């Protein structure tokens, strides 16, 4: 072979070898037990884990692998191109020493961006981050929960104020002097120290959380904020709802995220199972980033305040959400949308389909713009929340307390809601108040007391083939108050309708 041919081939070979070496480096696995991590859960592995992540990231990425065993750690800071992999039988147990989550990091806590204790697993501005495997992440939350209950009690006993601040509370005050806080939210922030979310990826892209089991979260469990392209698949979340209850231990709460897919998850928690959020009040409007392009499918929700919830922190807006093929069994509510004056934000283009509900302790459906019952009527502005273009279909339910309600506000009625192909049995029916353009098509609401459908202060009601399988004697199935305008009724039994 001539020299002129050999030289390019040599350079090509070197180039190919370089690419192969880069691929190998990218896929390198770091076995934490072989690297010296204590698999008996006695000695903290925090420093070793984070040092290994830094090393892997400096080499282009890799997998941080935990074989069978129990590993004690505090905050883990993920980097780009890092996979945290827990083998079946591996338990990553997090410290319950509050100081272990210093220094403060930037995070969004209950819809407000602040400096606070680090989430248990955290990343900032990272790309391609994965948590995977059949192992268990244990947040060891009991001490955090007891602190929360004790702090609430102290604040209540001292007229809504903390009498003194401890070290961490004073650090929080010093770190957040410029934080803008609405009057409505000030009582919540009086704690001056805040339980960290279990997992918060902040301003990250290409996130995957799959197959792991997550238990005993100190606060919200999976809480990506300002992220794009998030996949959460096959995850089991168990936070106790009693004996003792883990307060505010929501399951999955994307906040101001885009392109989120949640599927095949099992969730039983001490608050809402899945909640879609986008910031609180002025702080949320300042960032102005909606939570949008969200799919939730094939999930089972057991104990929890709500099955799938939107709000109440939704000041940046929530748009284009599809919820399908889910079971709610034993939650307090099924589908719940909540907001209040002062929030602002638009919730729109929501689709709910093929849902089964059972043993719902409260309402199957809630659409509530009047979450703050003390608020007063005000001119429409950026502070005014909006619910519109929301459609629900193919829902069945039994053993339900109330079918639910719509509650708009005088200056902004809830608008453009439809309910179709439903068969629900409950103790009490459905009430709509301060709403426009509400449609029911092929809906059976069977109740034990009162009307199945009750409308007040509404404009534009369309009823097609609505009924009760067991009408109550001397009780209308549909009650329409005199302040309701523009009602269209077809294919209904007129003897079961009362128009006042």
Question: What label would you give each PLM region?
Answer:
Residues 24-500:
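Extracellular/periplasmic carbohydrate-active domains that bind, remodel
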Residues 1-30:
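Bacterial Sec-dependent N-terminal signal peptides
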